Amino acid sequence: MDRLLLDSNVVVYLDQDPGRVTQHARDQIDGASEVYVSAVTGWELSIKQATGALKMKTTVSSLVESLGFLELPITMRHGEAVKMLPMIHRDPFDRLLVAQSIIEGLTLVTSDSRLVRYGTPILQV
């Protein structure tokens, strides 16, 4: 688990309640050579902030920068890979994160146990 991609829920936990991330997951995040946060996470969390469903202490981009994480842009390849995924999960944000993790060879860090069914490497928090 050298290169990681954080699910949106993990980014929220790190902002609001770091204790929800297990010690094992924190150790893996701290020891990873690269930790990415997708642009889709910025989009998803911004929508939730705009609708009042989520309050964050800072912007997603500021949080990512302050934690020393890398931004993963959304590419056409990522978008096209979504069509190859089985309809296990209907959330378009999660489906794009799974596609990105597969295309980029990243371990997805998440609390969503349903994502394991896609076959991509998962680190549960």
Predicted segments with their positions:
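Acidic, PIN/NYN-like endoribonuclease modules and their adjacent C-terminal/linker elements
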Residues: V98-V125
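Generic structural signal for small/hydrophobic residues in well-ordered secondary structure
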Residues: D7-S8, L45, V82, S101
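A generic structural signal for short hydrophobic patches within well-formed alpha-helices
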Residues: V11, G42, G79, L115-V116
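Short, well-structured N-terminal submotif of metal-dependent ribonuclease cores
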Residues: M1-V37, A50-S62, E104, V116-R117
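Acidic catalytic patch
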Residues: V60-M87
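Acidic donor-binding loop at a coil-to-helix junction in glycosyltransferase catalytic cores
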Residues: F93
